[in-house]
Amino acid sequence: MVASRAIGSLRRFTASQTLRCPGYICRNFTRSSALLTRTHINYGVKGDVAVIRINSPNSKVNTLGQELHSEFIEVMNEVWSSSQIRSAVLISSKPGCFIAGADINMLSACTTSQEVTQISQEAQRTFEKLEKSTKPIVAAINGTCLGGGLELAISCQYRIATKDKKTVLGAPEVLLGILPGAGGTQRLPKMVGVPAAFDMMLTGRGIRADKAKKMGLVDQLVEPLGPGLKPPEERTIEYLEEVAVTFAKGLADKKISPKRDKGLVEKLTSYAMSIPFVRQQIYKKVEEKVRKQTKGLYPAPLKIIDVVKTGIEQGSDAGYLSESQKFGELAMTKESKALMGLYRGQTLCKKNKFGAPQKEVKHLAILGAGLMGAGIAQVSVDKHLKTILKDASLPALGRGQQQVFKGLNDKVRKKALTSFERDSLFSNLTGQLDYQGFEKADMVIEAVFEELSLKHKVLKEVEAVIPDHCVFASNTSALPISEIAAVSKRPEKVIGMHYFSPVDKMQLLEIITTEKTSKDSTASAVEVGLKQGKVIIVVKDGPGFYTTRCLAPMMSEVLRILQEGVGPKKLDSLTTSFGFPVGAATLMDEVGMDVAKHVAENLGKIFGERFAGGNLDVLKQMISKGFLGRKSGKGFYVYQEGVKNRNVNSDTESILASLKIPSRPDISSDEDIQYRLVTRFVNEAVLCLQEGILATPAEGDIGAVFGLGFPPCLGGPFRFVDLYGAQKVVDRLRKYEAIYGKQFTPCQLLIDHASSPNKKFFQ
């Protein structure tokens, strides 16, 4: 679902030229304009098997766009019309990617649902021809096979896949707010059964090749090859092609049957699905679960259920028509535009726009073996980075090392790693109490307590032992990097790398640069973050940077709303029903009252009244009683091991009651409470762009969604302003400003967008 890049190029032939390659039984290629202009696909013939190679130019992946689709139709028509060809193999020339899905830019360019429906119907017709082909077609899958790529593969008569970690099959369209639009909603249930098909399409979950084989999604597996005269990726593709050609010949000769024998469980499932009452119960249960999980905020899952149901109950023709129509409708929804915008932003934030650093970071050192330090260590050794984990305390160091091992061992339990791979990765970690080995470090990341004097102390100690090229990064969430760098002998090598907890699960990394930070230091930080698998935003230095600065005023409003008498459970319900993955009161417990108070006091001193809201005495009293949040077992809720339905902490309710403030009925409806929270967040985000803290709106959206849990269905604060309307946001702010003053005063950039309706953050 992203753009693509070529590894090879198409050869041109005159009418008399033939393709002569080892292992080929060749045929003549006539010169034609279609052949000469083909850039995404080329093919040759091995015996009587056409080997069709997909290799889109200028990208690491193949995507199904208009050009590739047109070329594919041309090639298949040649294959079907040739008497010398009895079968075909579809394979990608790109290592690690079969087809990553449809080109979402093609969908974004459409202005009506009818245009999108037409694209769907064209793809449906093409894949129907594949499905009904009298010449067997084998899909040889190596790497990602997603979305339209999967729909293409399941239209073929046979599928062979490499048993490699990079080979993943899936239908992730729901994550973009759409549904499989090239026949996937109709073929997938028939191939793997309705329950498994629903699971794939409603979650967007990727399926590994070995599991795909058990499900019936793949017919045969091929072991990847190791290094030889050629790189392992190249050897694997060549071997996969050889195996696929053999199976294609076997299918054409009727020596291999494309029909797979179903196991007992599959037979029982098929029988159960033949009973109307059972089917209706399954539809009902799945729909109930979807409504509960999505809270009605995402239309795509319910449409997927509807389309699958139509195909099963009314037949394939009705199913395909419903699929194409619903595909068109969904592509025009605000939710889909928001999710596609996030996808594009995520793609941009996975690139190093600062170029390659002068020296690759091969040796990493981390100061502090606490929750954050150990988390950073885990995502580093996990990616084969040699890592030193240092702490001043032996027990703390032991806990940190154990946390890293546990994280790796969890992957063994989930069969993502073998025990040998776990031990090999863990061997990249060295735990120590001193600075031995720091003279080889290419980067040091400090993750010590949020206290400026302590950070100054470790910075001075580190600079006494590290080499000149070494970058010093601070994992601070709010302390200005320029203040940390004030004691540095080399401020150009000091940078901020703000990770989010838990580090192994949170995708975002916020990198903070000062006026003195060099471009090379930034490039090094981005390179390390990308190795760790992070989505990266780069922001300028300032109090709270971007993420903490946006979250702080919203948390201040949370505190005020709680003081006004809205209970934690009610507030959580209001925020999750708006699209936040975690309720506001629960989020406070996750952050911790001590951290929340520390940030609120520091940023409050700097930003003044704009960051005011609830009374910090609430937090102070909670801290004094040990109610720090989840980490202490009590916060707004009481936390017990294994208990999902948490009770509200009655002692905290008493504190809130003692500090209760009157609510205003005109701004205290459920909707007003939701918008009081969201507008403070959005206004601060736009102000960060106005002040140059943020470089782009896209990075602002990515930071808010992946770091702070801003509702994905809204696309981030900037996409929200575009889709909801800047004027409506300003009107909301003015309404609350009349009561609370500067805390809700809209920033100038937001006012500018409101006064010019055509002015958008995303054109």
Swiss-Prot record:
Q: Where in the cell is it found?
A: Mitochondrion; Mitochondrion inner membrane
Site note Important for long-chain enoyl-CoA hydratase activity applies to 151, 173
Q: Where is this site: Important for hydroxyacyl-coenzyme A dehydrogenase activity?
A: 498
Which keywords belong to this entry? Acetylation, Fatty acid metabolism, Lipid metabolism, Lyase, Membrane, Methylation, Mitochondrion, Mitochondrion inner membrane, Multifunctional enzyme, NAD, Oxidoreductase, Phosphoprotein, Transferase, Transit peptide
- Domain of life, source organism: Eukaryota
Q: Name one GO molecular function term.
A: long-chain fatty acyl-CoA hydrolase activity
Similarity comment: family membership = In the N-terminal section; belongs to the enoyl-CoA hydratase/isomerase family.
Q: What does this protein do?
A: Mitochondrial trifunctional enzyme catalyzes the last three of the four reactions of the mitochondrial beta-oxidation pathway. The mitochondrial beta-oxidation pathway is the major energy-producing process in tissues and is performed through four consecutive reactions breaking down fatty acids into acetyl-CoA. Among the enzymes involved in this pathway, the trifunctional enzyme exhibits specificity for long-chain fatty acids.
Q: Please state what the protein is called.
A: Trifunctional enzyme subunit alpha, mitochondrial
The organism is Sus scrofa
Q: What is the lineage of its organism?
A: Eukaryota, Metazoa, Chordata, Craniata, Vertebrata
